[in-house]
C-alpha cells in the first residue's frame, strides 16, 4: 500500500486533472427524438462537420439499394438532395460516399443536433475507474430501455451501455471525466434490438433514467416526456400519469414530435391539473395536431394501453410561457421635434404665401401651446423668414376687440345723428310762420349749412357736445 503522503499526492493530482477537464457544453436544439435518428430531417450533407466526406445525392445513387427511383414519395426522408438520412432503420443517419474504403460505399454521419433528449452522449471508458461506478450487468438481449429500467429500479440516475451487451448504472456527476467521443463511436448495435445503438469498445453511451418511465413530475420550463418503455415499444396494460406544473406560466405549448399509437383503445389524454377535467384525447384514430396550447400552468398527461397491441408510443415536447406584467411606458423625451404636415405643398406655400404655417411639434426651447380640442400647436416659420411668437394670438384678439368697439361706436353715432336730424325737422316746422318768401329761404338755407359744418365738427370732435347742432359759428 502506498504511504499516506503518496496517496495524498495522487488524490491531489487526480483532483487537478478533473478540475482542468471541462464539462460537456450545452447541446444544440434537438433535431431527433428517436434513439437512432430515423426522424432526422436536417440538412447536414457531410459525414462529419470537420474532416468528413461529402454525401452523394439520393437521386443519383441508382446503383445502390436506396434512391429516389425506388422510393419516389419521400419515404425515409429521401429526395433530390444529399442530406444524411436513415431510411433502413440503422443505428444512426448515414449517406453514400464516392470514395470507397475496403468496399464500403457508405458512412455514418456525425450529427451533433441528432441526439434525442435524455441521451447524454458518447464517452470514453478507460475502466479505471469507469464512468459509472454503480452496479452493472450483461445480457445478450440488451436494449436501451432494458438497461434504463434496470438502473431505474436500482434508483440510479444514469444508465450506460457498452459493446452492445453491457449495462452500467451510477450517479456519478463526472461521467464525462475520461472525455467525450464522437457519436459514431457508440454505434454498436444492441444485442436485443439491432436498430438501437448500445455503445462501443471502450465507449459508453449514457442515458437519463427518466427516459421511458411510467409517470413522473415535471416543473421545468421545457422538457420532453416519452411514453413508457421508450425507445422500446410500450408494454400492454400500462396506466401512467405525468404531472406538468410550472408555477406562474400563462400557457403551455405541446408538440407531439412522435406519435405512434395504432390501437383506438390505447389513448393519451391531457387533463386540467386542478379539476381533472379532460381537455383533449388522442388515440390510434384521432391523432394530435402538429402543436397546440393549453392556457394552464398545471396539466396532467395520462396514458393508457390495453392488453392487445403495442407500438413505439409518443414523445411530446412541452414549452411553458410566462407573460411578464406590462411595464409602465417611460415618459416621452421631448427633445426631438416631430413634424406632421403635407410635404408636397409645403415648399410652394412657403415661397409664395405670407400665411403662418402651423405644424405639430415639440421643442425644449419653445414650450407647446395648448389649444382646447386639438394637439399642442406652435407656429412655425413663415415666408418672410421671421418666427411668429406665441403672443401673436393676443395681438389678434386685441385687434378684434378694437374692431368691434369701432363698429359699435359707429352704430351709436349713426343713431345719435338720426335723432338730431329728427329734432331739426321739427324745428323747421315750427319756424314756418307767415311772412315774406325771402325769410323762409334764409331760414331753410342756414340749417343746411350748419348741419354740414356740424358733421365736420363731429369728425374732428373739437366742439362741446352740449351745443345745439343747428347753431353755426
Swiss-Prot record:
Region (Essential for apoptotic activity): 414-473
Name used for this protein in its record: Kremen protein 1
Limits of the CUB domain: 214-321
Places the protein is found: Cell membrane
Record topological domains on the Cytoplasmic side: 414-473
Record organism: Rattus norvegicus (Rat)
TM spans (from-to): 393-413
Lineage: Eukaryota, Metazoa, Chordata, Craniata, Vertebrata
CDD domains: CUB (cd00041), KR (cd00108)
Domain Kringle: 31-114
Amino acid at each position: 500500500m502506498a504511504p499516506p503522503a503518496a496517496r495524498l499526492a495522487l488524490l491531489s493530482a487526480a483532483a487537478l486533472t478533473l478540475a482542468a477537464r471541462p464539462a460537456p457544453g450545452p447541446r444544440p436544439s434537438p433535431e431527433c427524438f428517436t434513439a437512432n435518428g430515423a426522424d432526422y430531417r436536417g440538412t447536414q450533407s457531410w459525414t462529419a462537420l470537420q474532416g468528413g466526406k461529402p454525401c452523394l445525392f439520393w437521386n443519383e445513387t441508382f446503383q445502390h439499394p436506396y434512391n429516389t427511383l425506388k422510393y419516389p414519395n419521400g419515404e425515409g426522408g429521401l429526395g433530390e438532395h444529399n442530406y444524411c438520412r436513415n431510411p433502413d432503420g440503422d443505428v444512426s443517419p448515414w449517406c453514400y460516399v464516392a470514395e470507397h474504403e475496403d468496399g464500403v460505399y457508405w458512412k455514418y454521419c456525425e450529427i451533433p443536433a441528432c441526439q434525442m433528449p435524455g441521451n447524454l452522449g458518447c464517452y470514453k471508458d478507460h475502466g479505471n475507474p469507469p464512468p459509472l461506478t454503480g452496479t452493472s450487468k450483461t445480457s445478450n438481449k440488451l436494449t436501451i430501455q432494458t438497461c434504463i429500467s434496470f438502473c431505474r429500479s436500482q434508483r440510479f440516475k444514469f444508465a450506460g451501455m457498452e459493446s452492445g451487451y453491457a449495462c452500467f448504472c451510477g450517479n456519478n456527476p463526472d461521467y464525462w471525466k475520461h472525455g467525450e467521443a464522437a457519436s459514431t463511436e457508440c454505434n454498436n448495435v444492441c444485442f436485443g434490438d439491432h436498430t438501437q445503438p448500445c455503445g462501443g469498445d471502450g465507449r459508453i453511451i449514457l442515458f437519463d433514467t427518466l427516459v421511458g418511465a411510467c409517470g413522473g413530475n415535471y416543473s421545468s420550463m421545457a422538457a420532453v416526456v416519452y411514453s413508457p418503455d421508450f425507445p422500446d415499444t410500450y408494454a400492454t396494460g400500462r396506466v401512467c400519469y405525468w404531472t406538468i406544473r410550472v408555477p406562474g406560466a400563462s400557457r403551455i405549448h405541446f408538440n407531439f414530435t412522435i406519435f405512434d399509437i395504432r390501437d383506438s383503445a390505447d389513448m393519451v389524454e391531457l387533463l386540467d391539473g386542478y379539476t381533472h377535467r379532460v381537455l383533449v384525447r388522442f388515440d390510434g384514430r384521432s391523432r394530435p395536431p402538429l402543436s397546440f396550447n393549453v392556457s394552464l400552468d398545471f396539466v396532467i398527461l395520462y396514458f393508457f394501453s390495453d392488453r392487445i397491441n403495442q407500438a413505439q408510443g409518443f414523445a411530446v415536447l412541452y414549452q411553458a410561457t410566462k407573460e411578464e406584467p406590462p411595464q409602465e411606458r417611460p415618459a416621452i423625451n421631448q427633445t426631438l421635434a416631430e413634424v406632421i404636415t403635407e410635404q408636397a405643398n409645403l415648399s410652394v406655400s412657403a415661397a409664395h404665401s405670407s400665411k403662418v404655417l402651423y405644424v405639430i411639434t415639440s421643442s425644449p426651447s419653445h414650450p407647446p401651446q395648448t389649444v382646447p380640442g386639438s394637439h399642442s400647436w406652435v407656429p412655425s416659420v413663415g415666408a418672410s423668414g421671421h418666427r411668429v411668437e406665441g403672443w401673436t394670438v393676443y395681438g389678434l384678439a386685441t385687434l378684434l376687440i378694437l374692431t368691434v368697439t369701432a363698429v359699435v361706436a359707429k352704430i351709436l353715432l349713426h343713431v345719435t345723428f338720426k335723432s338730431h336730424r329728427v329734432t331739426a325737422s321739427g324745428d323747421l316746422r315750427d319756424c314756418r310762420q307767415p311772412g315774406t318768401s325771402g325769410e323762409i329761404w334764409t331760414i331753410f338755407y342756414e340749417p343746411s349749412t350748419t348741419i354740414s359744418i356740424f358733421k365736420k365738427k363731429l369728425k374732428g370732435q373739437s366742439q362741446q357736445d352740449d351745443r345745439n347742432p343747428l347753431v353755426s359759428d
